[in-house]
């Protein structure tokens, strides 16, 4: 074989090898493409099933919180949550907050709170003793967790707020703006649905605890006017975040602030703060048409702070030590009442629950049950009610619950900031225990030194 033939033969062999290799590569590509198409096709077929399941789950999850049941019979209070946010905040990213409250849907309970746009142990925590600023926002996190940027959900810009769930979506009410012209922004499922303008131009404010929902309608109480004299008070009825009706209370010589409201047998009862001249708590109860009754808790076991020593009560405002006050709550059971209050008569310290079997209508100071919650040597603060509906608990009654704010920092302690943690309890008809569940943080922090 001459050299030219050798070259032609070698070239032919290389060409054949190249063609075979190319065909193998093409076959490999086709095989991969077919395999991918089959997998993609399977995924496309599965997605409608997944979406169908998701939509079905949502449809089942959406209910109407009827609120028609009565409050559950209870004999005491079982501890429900404690977030330890100040202790955790000494080294972790935890919001500076005040006015925490709890509200439950048919699926979960969440802690709502008013931030100061700052974290604990940070320079922006300085001066956060101030109640109303443009930096304050309503946020929420799962109950029992310390509120941080990593687990919290923005709800509204607000220095006064309320929130509740009707079985379909969360309703939030956030008040912000200047003292002489604040506006409440209503959101339903996170979307602005309505607004309420200050009608007396004097610090429009609301509950700082959950609103109450019955049969798809939700209700709240707002105040506008002096904190130390006659003000104006309105009940609002809302449906899917829109105000459908309101009524102004005819309540001369009454003072309502920061009401704690709950449903009971299809009606709403609110127990509030008298910052003008009452050391006992005013109440307002109303039906779904906003037909209302008003009064004061008659018991000689006084519920506000500051207050006189227990004695003879009144079904009107108790004037001794009646000025100023603190947000609180009570639960009515017929003529009886569970009263939550600070242990101290003149400072926001300690907390206890007292059962007065005749206290809603009777003026004596006798009671049959007292359960310690926080020792008098530890700080407390605001407190308020919330409920767990049968749709959440599976019970045939509405479970009464309450939370207590444990304020730390200014003005009572040597810090540059004011914040708080919270604890909560729910009513049970079984064994409970009296103890002290204080905030427990060691102050001052590094930023305070």
UniProtKB/Swiss-Prot annotation:
Domain comment (free text): Intact N-terminus is essential for virion morphogenesis. Possesses two apical sorting signals, one in the ectodomain, which is likely to be a glycan, and the other in the transmembrane domain. The transmembrane domain also plays a role in lipid raft association.
Assembly mode: Homotetramer.
KW DNA damage (keyword) present: no
Residue numbers annotated as active site: 131, 382
Activity regulation, short description: Inhibited by the neuraminidase inhibitors zanamivir (Relenza) and oseltamivir (Tamiflu). These drugs interfere with the release of progeny virus from infected cells and are effective against all influenza strains. Resistance to neuraminidase inhibitors is quite rare.
One biological process term in Gene Ontology: carbohydrate metabolic process
Protein name as it appears in the record: Neuraminidase
SUPFAM superfamilies documented for this protein: Sialidases (SSF50939)
Residues bearing carbohydrate: 68, 126, 215
Region described as Hypervariable stalk region: 36-70
Chain segments annotated as coiled-coil in the UniProt record: none
HAMAP family named among the record's database cross-references: INFV_NRAM
Domain of life: Viruses
Post-translational modification: N-glycosylated.
Family listed: Belongs to the glycosyl hydrolase 34 family.
Cited function: Catalyzes the removal of terminal sialic acid residues from viral and cellular glycoconjugates. Cleaves off the terminal sialic acids on the glycosylated HA during virus budding to facilitate virus release. Additionally helps virus spread through the circulation by further removing sialic acids from the cell surface. These cleavages prevent self-aggregation and ensure the efficient spread of the progeny virus from cell to cell. Otherwise, infection would be limited to one round of replication.
Keywords on record: Calcium, Disulfide bond, Glycoprotein, Glycosidase, Host cell membrane, Host membrane, Hydrolase, Membrane, Metal-binding, Signal-anchor, Transmembrane, Transmembrane helix, Virion
Involved in apical transport and lipid raft association as annotated region, ranges: 11-33
Gene Ontology MF terms in the entry: exo-alpha-sialidase activity; metal ion binding
Gene3D superfamilies cross-referenced by the UniProt entry: 2.120.10.10
Pfam families given in the database record: Neur
Stretches assigned to the Intravirion side: 1-6
Known EC number: 3.2.1.18
Residue intervals annotated with topology Virion surface: 28-449
More about this protein: The influenza A genome consist of 8 RNA segments. Genetic variation of hemagglutinin and/or neuraminidase genes results in the emergence of new influenza strains. The mechanism of variation can be the result of point mutations or the result of genetic reassortment between segments of two different strains.
């Amino acid at each position: 074989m001459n050299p030219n033939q050798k070259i032609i033969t070698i070239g032919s062999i290389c060409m054949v090898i190249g063609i075979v290799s190319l065909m193998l590569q093409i076959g490999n590509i086709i095989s991969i493409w077919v395999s991918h198409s089959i997998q993609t096709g399977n995924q496309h077929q599965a997605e409608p099933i997944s979406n169908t399941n998701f939509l079905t789950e949502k449809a089942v999850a959406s209910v109407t919180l009827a609120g028609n049941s009565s409050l559950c019979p209870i004999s005491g209070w079982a501890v429900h949550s404690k977030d330890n946010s100040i202790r955790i905040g000494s080294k972790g990213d935890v919001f500076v907050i005040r006015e925490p409250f709890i509200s439950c849907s048919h699926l979960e309970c969440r802690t709502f709170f008013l931030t100061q746009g700052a974290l604990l142990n940070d320079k922006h925590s300085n001066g956060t003793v101030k109640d109303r600023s443009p930096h304050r926002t309503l946020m929420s996190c799962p109950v029992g967790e310390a509120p941080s940027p990593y687990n919290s959900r923005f709800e509204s810009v607000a220095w006064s707020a309320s929130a509740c769930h009707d079985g379909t979506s969360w309703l939030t009410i956030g008040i912000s703006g200047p003292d002489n012209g604040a506006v409440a922004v209503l959101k339903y499922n996170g979307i602005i649905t309505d607004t309420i303008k200050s009608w007396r131009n004097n610090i429009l404010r609301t509950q700082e605890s959950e609103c109450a929902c019955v049969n798809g309608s939700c209700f709240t109480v707002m105040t506008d006017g002096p904190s130390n004299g006659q003000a104006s008070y309105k009940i609002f009825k809302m449906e899917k975040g829109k105000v459908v009706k309101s009524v102004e209370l005819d309540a001369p010589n009454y003072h309502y602030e920061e009401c704690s409201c709950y449903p009971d047998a299809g009606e709403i009862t609110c127990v509030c703060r008298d910052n003008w001249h009452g050391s006992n708590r005013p109440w307002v109860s109303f039906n779904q048409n906003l037909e209302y009754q008003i009064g004061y808790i008659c018991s000689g076991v006084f519920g506000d702070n500051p207050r006189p020593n227990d004695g003879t009560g009144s079904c009107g405002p108790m004037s001794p030590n009646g000025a100023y006050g603190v947000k609180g709550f009570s639960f009515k059971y017929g003529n009886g009442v569970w009263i939550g209050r600070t242990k101290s008569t003149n400072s926001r310290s300690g907390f206890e629950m007292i059962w007065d079997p005749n206290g809603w209508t009777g003026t004596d100071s006798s009671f049959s049950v007292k359960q310690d919650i926080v020792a008098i040597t530890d700080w407390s603060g605001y407190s308020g009610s919330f409920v767990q509906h049968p749709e959440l608990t599976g019970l045939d009654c509405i479970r009464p619950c309450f939370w207590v704010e444990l304020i730390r920092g200014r003005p009572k302690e040597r810090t540059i900031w004011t914040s708080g943690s919270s604890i909560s309890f729910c009513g049970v008809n079984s064994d409970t225990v009296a103890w002290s569940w204080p905030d427990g943080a060691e102050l001052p922090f590094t930023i305070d030194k």
